[in-house]
């Protein structure tokens, strides 16, 4: 295991933010969501910090899903969300049925027909709504932490979805 040096305060802040939305009083209340941005220079240990934090969340009974952004023009649209939603649905497969058609645009294995992926506003709205529903329903049974690593490399659709999820009331602690 890598040495974990000099990040105790950062880990404490992440833990406090998690507890603020997941633990009573004030937390674990319908509609609570939190957003924490971890910044720093390349190689400073952000991913190591988040890995340590994820271990704490899991030990506390929470769920953690990851998505990693690609650096470069070859990245598929929505890629970090495809990974995070795929992991969420793997852990809670019962959620897939209610959002299958909408999420098929970004989680291809959910498609029953060949989906058409475009930037049409209606498609984006359906994807945003379905992603929010999926994450909110997953968070209703246990606190859910979504980690989007290397967010500086995210495509605009992924950033827009993050904004939506962070501002939309959720039925659980997200």
Cite the ranges covered by each PLM segment.
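Key residue(s) within conserved catalytic/signature motifs
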Residues: 1-174
